[in-house]
Structure formats: C-alpha cells, structure tokens
C-alpha cells in the first residue's frame, strides 16, 4: 500500500492529521444533527453546511499540499548564464547550483524552490508550489475547528442541563468522546492558529522562515555600520499576498526567477548568503574526537549536563569515532555542531556527515581559520 503516490501519506504526520480531521468531522456532524438539526431551519442548515465546507476544504488542501509538493529543482541544475554561477551556492548532493530562494532539504533529499520549512504533518516541504494550499489548509482547519468547538460545547451544555433534551440521552462513552473531541478542536485552533499567524506574517513580508533567519544574520553582520540589508522580494503587502493566494492556489512564476524591488537583483540574497558562508568559515575551528559519539539523542553516558541540555532542533546527531576530525561552526555549552572532515574521492560525491555531538567528546586542536567547508545548503 505504501508505494508510489501513497508513500507520502504513510507517515505518522499525515496519518495523525487525517485521524484528527476524521474524528472532529464525524463527532461534530453527529452532535450538530442532534443539537441543531439542519432540517429545522435555514440557519441550522447554514450552520451544518458551513462546517461541512470547512471540513471538506481542510481535507482538500491538506491532500493537495502533500501531493502537489513544494516544487524541486532539477538535479544538476545550472543558471542560464554560466557567469551567474559565481553568485550561487553549489549543492553536492544534487550536484547542481541552488537557484535564488532554493535550499536543500535533507529529509526530501532535493533542493526545494522557495523553501519555507519541512512540515512533518504533510510529510513534505512547504515551498513555491504548495504554499497556497498549505496556508489554505491551516485557515480551513482553524475555521472548521472553531465552529466545531462551539457546536460541541453547546451539545455538552444541553446534555448536562437539567432540562429535557430533544434527542436520546448519550452514553457515558459518547460523552467522554465528545469532551475529548472538544480538546482536539481547541488544540487545533490554538496551535494551528499560531502557525497560521506566522505563515501570514511570512507571506505579507514575502520572506520565508529561512530567509528571515538569513536577514537576521545580515542585520548582525552590519551592526555598527551605516550599511543596511534590504530584503529584495518584498514589494508591498498586497503584491506579496498575490504571489501566494490565487483562486486555485496555483503558484505564480517558475520558482527560479523572482520579482525584486528597485536597487536589487536576482542574486542580492544569494550574495548575502555567500558572504555569511565566508564569515562562517572564518569562525570555524578544528576539533579532534577523544571519546566516541554514538549519534544518540539521549547520550546519558556523557553526563547529565549533555542529557538535560540538548539543542532544541531536529538536526542530525552524528556518530563519530576517536581520532575523527570535525570542523565546528556552532557552539553550545554541552553540544557542538560541525562537519566531519573527509578525504575527497575524484568523481565521487562525498556524503556530508554533519550535525550535533556532545562537547565532552572533543577537544579543540588549533585556532587557525583556514578551513574549506563543502559548499551546500544554508544552515
């Protein structure tokens, strides 16, 4: 069953989301028909249809976001002008250049057009092609669950009141199931509503989650100077929203060439990324592994400090052996982030080994900053 197109569905994220959608929809329809039967009046029918619309819209846009996908760059992609390659980062995994706004997703294994983030609930990235569907899914889920919460709470109040009810008394199991569903609905309204809020801010600014991080680093790079970094893709909130919201949620543009504001060009952001990469290389330090790292997320053998202070990220924890050399670019009190130094093999792409490992496993070797990190996706 989990082959071909269905492979994207067979994952804990989509299956959990589909289960929540199904439970909320079925229980709400059941309670709505008892509390306010649609045949009773025009407004009762409108209430029933309104919820049904949101439920159907949630399911449609959810499935569309999964199967439409974010849009991936072709393998070994190159810009039309060979001279433009100097402004782009090279992806060793895809063996091609990354177009403006594109980033490599280690979970999808490809470079994603206008990558925002990898969402476990759709088991896919949110990017250029499915950004509209994903946002519509969030909005529909929040709207539908808000209506569901009102209907279910009204049903419970009616059942628990001392007045006669116009439908058969529910069993204890049914009452518990409805209260559980209320919790699910409220949880969706709060959590998905917060995600929808951040997505709308991102769309209004025309700045993805990754680009927001790049802009923040660009600000700190220029701190104390008169130079300012201007995000090149924000051309006003209305224009920005039209780039994502269309009648059929289809993407605008080819995902490679983007409208930019006056004074910027297609490579304004990529040039900034390259400059940040150079700064990162200058800060890099070499560490030698003195204790093996198992790659475990719960490395209790390295002490309670390491165990209780993990990096709050889903980035890889890497396995390392004694005498391995790691180029470290990020530091925490109990953890280090770096890339394992490997020997290059001619005509054979190296699979990069980089991620977090416990700080007690390594000691710094030298203070030199002359290191060359394999060029790939932005951190």
Residue spans for each PLM region:
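Membrane-associated feature with strongest affinity for ZDHHC
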Residues: 1-104, 109-118, 122-379
């Amino acid at each position: 069953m989990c082959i071909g197109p269905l492979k994207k569905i067979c994952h804990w994220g989509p299956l959990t989301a589909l289960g929540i959608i199904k439970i909320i929809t079925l229980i709400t329809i059941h309670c709505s028909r008892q509390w306010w039967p649609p045949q009773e009046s025009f407004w009762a029918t409108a209430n029933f249809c309104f919820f049904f619309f949101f439920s159907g819209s949630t399911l449609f846009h959810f499935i569309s976001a999964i199967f439409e996908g974010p849009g991936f760059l072709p393998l070994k992609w190159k810009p039309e002008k060979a001279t433009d390659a100097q402004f782009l980062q090279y992806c060793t995994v895809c063996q091609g250049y990354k177009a403006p706004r594109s980033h490599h997703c280690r979970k999808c294994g490809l470079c994603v057009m206008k990558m925002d983030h990898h969402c476990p609930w759709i088991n896919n990235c949110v990017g250029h092609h499915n950004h509209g569907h994903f946002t519509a899914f969030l909005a529909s889920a929040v709207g539908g669950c808000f209506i569901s919460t009102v209907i279910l709470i009204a049903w419970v109040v009616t059942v628990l009141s001392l007045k006669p009810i116009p439908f058969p008394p529910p069993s204890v199991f049914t009452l518990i199931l409805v209260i559980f569903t209320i919790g699910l609905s409220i949880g969706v309204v709060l959590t998905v509503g917060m995600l929808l809020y951040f997505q709308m801010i991102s769309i209004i600014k025309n700045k993805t989650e990754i680009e927001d991080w790049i802009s923040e680093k660009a600000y700190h790079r220029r701190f104390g100077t008169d130079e300012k970094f201007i995000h090149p893709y924000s051309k006003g909130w209305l224009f920005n929203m039209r780039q994502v919201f269309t009648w059929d949620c289809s993407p605008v543009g080819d995902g490679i060439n983007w409208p930019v504001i006056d004074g910027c060009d297609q490579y304004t952001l990529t040039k900034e990324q390259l400059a940040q990469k150079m700064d990162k290389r200058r800060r890099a330090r070499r560490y030698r592994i003195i204790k093996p790292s198992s790659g475990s997320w719960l490395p209790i053998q390295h002490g309670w400090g390491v165990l209780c202070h993990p990096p709050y990220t889903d980035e890889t924890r890497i396995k390392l052996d004694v005498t391995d050399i790691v180029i470290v670019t990020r530091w925490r009190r109990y953890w280090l982030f770096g890339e394992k130094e490997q020997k290059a093999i001619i005509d054979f792409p190296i699979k990069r080994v980089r991620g977090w490992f416990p700080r007690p496993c390594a000691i710094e070797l030298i203070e030199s900053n002359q290191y060359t990190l394999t060029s790939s996706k932005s951190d």
